[in-house]
Swiss-Prot record:
Belongs to the FAM221 family. It holds the Pfam family FAM221. Residues 235-271 are annotated as: Disordered. Coiled coil: none annotated. It comes from Mus musculus. This is Protein FAM221A.
Amino acid sequence: MERLTLPPGGAEAVDEYLEYRRIVGEDDGGKLFTPEEYEEYKKKVLPMRLQNRLFVSWRSPTGMDCKLVGPETLCFCTHRYKQHKTDFETIPQQRPIALPCRVSGCRCKAYHYVPLNGTQPIRCRCKHFADQHSAALGFTCNACSKCSGFHSCYTCACGQPAYAHDTVVETRQERLAQGKPVGRDVPYAAMGGLTGFSSLAEGYMRLDDSGIGAPSVEVLDSAVSAMDHPFLRAMHAPSTSSPQPLAGGNEVGPSTQLSSLRKPEEDDMAYFERQYQERIKLEKAAKQKGKVPPLPSTKPS
């Protein structure tokens, strides 16, 4: 592997360029601003960006933001969110707010998120991929004449079909009125709906008001069961070397509890074989004592 070395001050120069790219985005047209142009750009754009930021999300009928759009998130037109118009001197009054694509020749008039199926575009009911459809409003298919417009039955992780979701563009005030997080004010371009690291997760995994929400106190205080993660099953008991009683009157110590955890170097076969051998030993030891314990759960996480 080739090793990269930087001259003195090189790391600082890289950080400055990354900061420049996050602030300017695509506004320089591929040609770096001069220091004077950069300062003038920041004086003009940053106050407007902080005041009139727009939050973009892909929302399910239940109100959950299944996807929070960021700078690199692709539109139906296959261009990224940062390649669309995202800065406004005054926020438009009409709803929904249209964010047209700025790429030359693109017919996209408004940002429209479309999910991926793994790494591939999802299919329309006409059997063609999303990127085989026109980016113009109506989203007709370019590969067939029977399609009346893109319509996919792809099911989101929230359980709702893709066609039931909407791409929502809203202001800070509109988002706060719904109790959804808005994060801190940042000067970066095309931040969309990103408000923190958790924004990168899917909605059903996000434990804030934009996702599935925080678990209830009852869930947090509930006892650890055999259905929980092996780490929780091993660590929920008090940290003591005394053996812990199990169902049926059997006892197991911390070392036995920890054995249910997968070791970093183990593959699936080695993990299940080790669990099987430990179960055999427990059965033999129990038979010698005249009792057979229930087999512990070995279901991996």
